[in-house]
Amino acid sequence: VAVGRALVRDPQVFLLDELLGNLDAKLRDQVRYELKKIQTQLGVTTIYVTHDQTEAMTMADHIVLMKDGHIMQQGTPNDLYAHPNSLFVASFVGTPQINKLTCKVVEKGGSLAFQCGELLLSVPDDLTALMQQYKGKEVIVGLRPSELTLAPEGQGEIEGTVDSVEPLGDGFI
């Protein structure tokens, strides 16, 4: 009702504060879709306040992620997901949540690697120059589950056992 009242007034800006929080999951998905469609059709600047990262990621062109009243990072949803500027941002954005490993930057066979307990991970080429300054130091390595792929035994860098699979219809967690 409140959104309908705002629409008929032809505002220049919408401020929507925790609008979908009280809706069940199915209705929230439907209303989120409709709100995005209406906002796009009207071309009205919309400031949407939410604690739900799914709402933020799916509805926003630009996100300002805040913690305790301070801006932690701002940018497009993809910027925050792919290039978080802090552990807080990396942990907040993405489902399932990013995996964090405490590792030491070491040199093995002339290349840099992350030593995470018994696990040894190659430092990606695009991070080698940056990681030089951390050689011998501990860092936190973030691994997004969506970026991991299965490889035949003996060909991957990480060996493990799948403990649980959550089917989502078109994918799995």
Regions inferred by a protein language model and the residue ranges of each:
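ABC ATPase nucleotide-binding domains
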Residues: 1-88
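Non-catalytic connector elements of ABC transporters
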Residues: 96-100, 107-173
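Short, P/G- and charge-enriched loop/turn segments at secondary-structure junctions
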Residues: 4, 90, 127-130
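ABC transporter nucleotide-binding domain
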Residues: 77-109
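Short, surface-exposed, polar/charged, turn-prone segments marking secondary-structure boundaries
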Residues: 35-36, 42-44, 49, 92-94, ...
